[in-house]
Amino acid sequence: MKKYFSFDKNISVQGRGFYIAAAGGAAYQNLSHIRAALQDQGFNVSLEDRSQDMGMLSLQGPYSREILSKLTQTPLDNESFPFNTNQMITVAGHRVRALRVSFVGELGWELHIPRASCVPVYQALHQVRYSQFIP
């Protein structure tokens, strides 16, 4: 049986564990592959799929840092928040995981947001974008 494992994901160390974010189209296959590998290797670990509990917003482009900085106290400069890292931050009063990534060759973040906070975070980002960056 051929196993499928997509490399379109972000994996980061979280204390003694890992945070894995996979692209939506390949998430199920990735989860199945990881579960099978854990079982095959006999690792004594737990794996929790939080896909249904989370949403994701992608904020990309040259103004992404300025827009996000209007809604968080977290420093977003290159030294404080290097490329390809992630941090738990507060955005518009909501705790989110911010991943500094780029899909367009420019500055950008992915925000992984608890389901209940998705709409308020989106609305806050949208308001900042239109009130300050769109003439």
Task: Give, region by region, the residue ranges found by the protein language model.
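Basic, glycine/lysine-rich polyanion-binding surfaces/domains
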Residues: 1-135
